[in-house]
Amino acid sequence: MRENTRAQRSVGFLLGLVDEETAVRVRARTGLPEPETPAQARGRVTRAWTWARGLEASVALWIMENDDPQLNALVWRYIPTDSGLRRAIARGVPFAAGRVDPLPVDVTLPGQEPEIPESYVRHGLVGALREVTTVHQGRAAASMVLTRADWATVGAADRERPLPGYARWALNVRPDCPPSVRAGFGTHAKFTHRLRQAGVFESAADYVASEGPAIRVLEVLSMGRLLFPARLKEAEDALRPLVDEHLGDREDAWAVLVQLAETFHGNTPELIVTAGAVA
């Protein structure tokens, strides 16, 4: 069976937000195929090189929240430059809420734990962070913050005496940095913008409104039931009102969306609004 194109998968995800009667009519009008079968979706997930390039840091974390060693091994190559998440995968650190037991590490994991920084060996977790004077040192020291207990320790240390700026920044751009700890590092609008540039989002709703191209976000969302089922509903709830208002049951608007999806440079909300306006 021929695999659906990126545009078909992306529009198909949005089409899943309307009622079945409308979806059937739109497919008949636009020629969109039926939704992927579970087997097709699983096959596409295993071909991570087709969707995981430039994977946003928060999306990588949401995938890791499944505590699935095979998924962890898949995303290993595509996790952003911060080595903290890679170290966590290599050590079997769990990320699902409430889980404390370590995970088995998949035999297909394509790499080893990053080197432990010398400053950590000499000074321990907080001591290494307090010694930071460069960006590189900050990233290295922050990569040793792995568990919930580690984050609690770091947050308490920063409240007692603020950590160096480079250390704070390296911790702040970790997608697994707890909101309570991140709040202590500052809430300036410029700071929030830099977090988004680093691929760190407070929620799935923020992710759907992130910078374009929209097809990049929609393709990842189209695999959300397998990659991050616990986060998908929030993304769907953020997009559904836009879909209802600007596309709804208008077959012509959906036809325009199909034409625009592959080449549109704006983000997902802008794509939806534009398709409705053009039609």
What kind of feature is each model-predicted range?
Residues 1-279:
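Alpha-helical scaffold segments
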